[in-house]
Amino acid sequence: MSLANHTFSNPSRVLQRNESLFTNKNILVAGNIDDEYPLQLQALANSSTFCFSDYRYYSVLKDKLTTSEVHFTDNYQGETKFDLLLIFLPKAKQETLYLLANLTPHLQPGASIILVGEKKCGIKSADSLLASYSNRINMIDSARHCSILHAELNQPVNAFTQSQWIKTYPLNINNTELQICSLPGVFSYGELDKGSELLLQNLPDKMSGRVLDFGCGAGVIACYVLKKHPQLSVDLVDINAFALASAKLSLQSNQLEGNVFPSNVFSDIKEKYNILLSNPPFHSGKNTDYTAAETFINQSTNHLKSKGKLSIVANRFLNYEGLLFKAFSNVKIDQESNKFKVLSCITKT
């Protein structure tokens, strides 16, 4: 992924109008970071620490933020006390609350808390998210359908305990019982989505070899196939730090073993697999984006062994069959519901 021609997002452009907020400050930055504006923040601040939850932007920016501390993390645990926290507002309210709970203990009393985001992400009502941290909350700018909220940290802050944020739910599909754990910021937080459920109900009875769970989320697919087929070797990948942490928790909760690591589609994958499984992501932050799913399909044959199989679930309106027919044989629809379809195919060689 290259950001060479990547323009600043609207939230970043609004921040550009207010850069005096960051001048000579010791800043902690997190949330929906999706452009190169961190480079400007680094230049403005006295010191800067960035907590990325999206592996794509972490991978591109980690070596450019040469004077900053840079983390890809679901749970920041540094020792520094900052005088400003900037959160690029995520789409999910629970993720914002989680970030505030995790990061405010690392602030000095009286520090600034700044939320920036678009109206469609809920910035207009985000002052309620800050109420337990401050009684001095102001909207200091609004433009490009975005706003900046500023709060002074003047309320007591509790120590952060990640376990309080984990939602665990039971799962029973085809007489296979599981406990799934998920953190805020993960797709279908705290419940099984209907697409993944349809995929699990229609996987083959026999599986062997090495399996990849692409876009693993909370690890539902991997946990299911490992419980059904303990002999499998399973890798789980995602770009989301909260998803990867959740997948590890789900594996542990079910006494299962899998290899969990970040990868932007196949960027960090060197193996070839017998089976690729996925409920492919089609959101990037707050926007609909099919790039990752299409890249996964287009490059999947490079990571499958001879006669390797791919099984995915997708919204019915998406024409993934057209992409699959280019590289696979025996492309078929295994099952359909009113919203989803399960597709499977085999490599041509």
Curated annotation (Swiss-Prot):
Query: What is this protein's function?
Result: Specifically methylates the guanine in position 1207 of 16S rRNA in the 30S particle.
**What is the official name of this protein in its record?**
Ribosomal RNA small subunit methyltransferase C
Subunit field text: Monomer.
**Signal peptide bounds:** none
EC number in record: 2.1.1.172
Domain of life the protein comes from: Bacteria
Primary subcellular site in the record, as a coarse category: cytoplasm
Instruction: For this UniProt record, give its keywords in alphabetical order, as a comma-separated list.
Output: Cytoplasm, Methyltransferase, rRNA processing, S-adenosyl-L-methionine, Transferase
Disulfide bond entries: none
> Mind listing the GO molecular function terms for this protein?
16S rRNA (guanine(1207)-N(2))-methyltransferase activity; nucleic acid binding
- InterPro entries xrefs: DNA_methylase_N6_adenine_CS (IPR002052), Mtase_sm_N (IPR013675), rRNA_ssu_MeTfrase_C (IPR023543), RsmC/RlmG (IPR046977), SAM-dependent_MTases_sf (IPR029063), Small_mtfrase_dom (IPR007848)
| Localization (cell) | Cytoplasm
What Pfam family does this protein match (any one)? MTS_N
Q: Which GO terms describe its cellular component?
A: cytoplasm
Its recorded reaction(s) are: guanosine(1207) in 16S rRNA + S-adenosyl-L-methionine = N(2)-methylguanosine(1207) in 16S rRNA + S-adenosyl-L-homocysteine + H(+)
Q: Does the keyword Ribonucleoprotein apply?
A: no
Describe the family membership recorded for this protein in Swiss-Prot or TrEMBL.
Answer: Belongs to the methyltransferase superfamily. RsmC family.
